Amino acid sequence: MTRISRRSLIMLALLLLAVPAAAQGTDKVQRLTVPITDPARPITVHVSLMSGGIVMEAHEGKQVMIEVVPEDDGEAKERSGGMRVIPNRSLGLTVEEEDNEVSIGSDYSSKIEKLVIKVPRKTSVSASNVNDGDISVRGLEGELELNSVNGSITATDVAGSVVAHTTNGEVKVSFTSIQAGKSMSFVSFNGDVDVTFPSNLKADLHLTAGQGDIYTDFEFDLVPVESQTKSEREGKKFVVKLDQDVRARIEGGGAEMHFKTWNGSIYIRKAK
């Protein structure tokens, strides 16, 4: 199947999704199956939403299956003069697949409460959202890059590597195995950072917890760090800032793991 015909099929499916729920039955959830160019190879999924949550789960199939849960418009309200609201059911969603890469995106007018995306287990993910939803990933094997502004990030029973950053929310990750030698990063501005690693973890930890504490049940060695002094002039004031993180080494060291939170605590757990 050529690239053009594949995109045409996906866009046709999206047009069908836009049919009002009343014409399709009482189920407001819209569903779309995305064919993959070569199901024998791992895939990569890129998801970007302005508004709405993202849920990604592993399944045993070879396709990407998307469920779109629209916002609840509520019942149409009476307007002055007897006028009533006509619901706008445009999803504002775009899906493309090319050479085992699936891109899913929304525009500013999207009316999505959340996407539930089922993918083959060996899938790498780049997912981001801004408002009105969290990011949740379960059971995947690959490289995960997860970014949110106003939501929490959860990755459960994943294998490979994770970069998870959010501004307002918690970061919680549990690994079944990790990619040896791969650096990772876990950051929240307003929330706890809680990561569970396999018991055989070897890593060099870079830790910053501005207003909180750092906890671990791994055996570790602290690594001496020189304080970094930054000076700058702010108007008529001369400001000196002292910046120092905590460095620790587990089992002789390994890949660099960065943990950072300003208004929260850091938990580094050993899987039981």
Regions found by a protein language model. Name each.
Residues 183-186, 194-197:
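A contiguous pocket-lining binding segment that forms or flanks enzyme active sites
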Residues 23-128, 138-139, 145, 162-165, ...:
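Acidic (Asp/Glu) and glycine-rich low-complexity loops/linkers
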Residues 188-192, 201-203:
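Repeat-solenoid scaffold signature
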Residues 18-20:
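N-terminal signal peptide c-region/cleavage motif recognized by signal peptidases
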Residues 71, 133, 151, 169, ...:
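Hydrophobic lipid-interacting interfaces of membrane-associated proteins
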Residues 1-10:
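Bacterial N-terminal signal peptides that target proteins for export
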